[in-house]
């Protein structure tokens, strides 16, 4: 994967806006598109190309050169129809990698069948992360890999500093 990617983010609510802003801060070229001019204005100077436009229109996306981008992210909020339309347009334009936010299991299944490479269930993922870290202050982050398996990033307690896993009692874990 190239170090600097060209990413288009459609839907600039809390989810899409934060994704666009963070990707730009990480050094990627980011085109951020939303039909709401005010949302676009809030990202001025925080993304490479802030654009007000209707991303459900193929002509708009083609005029913007979206077909030349490496990654397409569909962060559209509650409008499931628009989410599906943009996902199909990204697929039609042969974007190499498409990520879409789903609002339900059925919506997620639909996005996968449409060819989205990664489907995000933001609320479910955050709920799972909170549940795994709430009563364990050493858990900084949690990522579910499968239904019964996950990976945690832990803050190492001082008592384990300079110890091997075996010495700390984790050899069989």
Residue ranges of model-derived segments:
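Cytosolic regulatory regions of ion transport systems
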Residues: 1-173
